[in-house]
Amino acid sequence: MTRAIHLFAGPGGLELGAEAVGVSGVGIEWDANAVATRVAAGLATVHGDVRRYGPADFPDATVLTAGPPCQTYTVAGSGAGRQAMADVLGAVKAMGARTAVDSGLLGDERTGLVLEPLRWILAALDSGRPYTAVVLEQVQQVQQVQQVWNAYAEVLRVEGYSVATGVLRTEQFGVPQTRRRAVLVARLDGPVALPEPSRRPYRRGVAQDAGDGRLEPWLSMGDVLPHRGPFTVISNYGTGGDARNRGRRTRREPAFTVTGKISRLRLVAPDGRELPRLSHGEAGLLQGFPAEFPWSGNDVAQQIGNACPVQLAAALVHAATQPALEVAA
């Protein structure tokens, strides 16, 4: 079985997806709560800071995946946000050229953590044992993160990788929620492409069975929570910045983006009665985790919100590791 190293591994979404397509591995995670969940789930785990490790510590790994925390690079076009982005893009270019990067920049969690996957990739290349496949994904600040992945792509192509970047919609990969994720897939031994959606995109007001007949319907909340009966979810976020105008979706639609605030979502019955809020297991189902996944530790809602949806992870890892002939076909 192919072996992977998973950086910023969280509770295990990337691992479960990777294992589904034949890639086993070990994850590095610093958060004690996420580590508790991983251990309970039987996932191979190193509890530590990815900055203290490197490829030499995991010599069997030929695949690298990562979902580095990407701090807010821009808030309302702030000068500080633009400067942070400029610093990161400059550092990516410098690292590719093997020139020194300001240690203060690398030590700043706002900028340094998003550079860690590149440090690992380049170190593996320079050691003569390069990763044959790379998968990077992130949900926060999608447009800004995509700039970083595009800068990574320029460096990796110079090193001989085939690279594809883009923004994917989770409901098109069998996840019962609408969410966009900025992704990068790369491989060293052949061409690569982003995974093709298997399901239709969600459009408000368009029936689940309508649209491109070549694709399967998106999944609704009711599809994975059939025991719940009829309900409407009321978002904890206001539409257009108006806290009084909270979005609503019925069980016949996908969930809103699952975030660390999912425990605040209200569920109401058709007659207006308040229903019990989502359990951790139910919230995990909306991210593609098994119903009995052993969520552990504290701040479980945040763990769930931070996780990579399992089905999307499987599609990404398969795209990066499938035989080259499949891509060419």
Residue ranges and their predicted role:
Residues 64, 184, 305:
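Short, conserved catalytic/metal-binding motifs centered on acidic residues
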Residues 4-54, 65:
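SAM cofactor-binding core of SAM-dependent methyltransferases
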Residues 11, 111-118, 149, 283, ...:
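Short, well-ordered alpha-helical scaffold segments within catalytic/effector domains
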Residues 221-329:
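C-terminal target-recognition/interaction regions appended to catalytic cores
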Residues 12, 33, 69-71, 140-141, ...:
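Short, solvent-exposed loop/turn segments at secondary-structure junctions
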Residues 19, 35-39, 53-61, 73-257, 321:
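Class I S-adenosyl-L-methionine
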Residues 61-67:
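Short SAM/SAH-binding signature in class I
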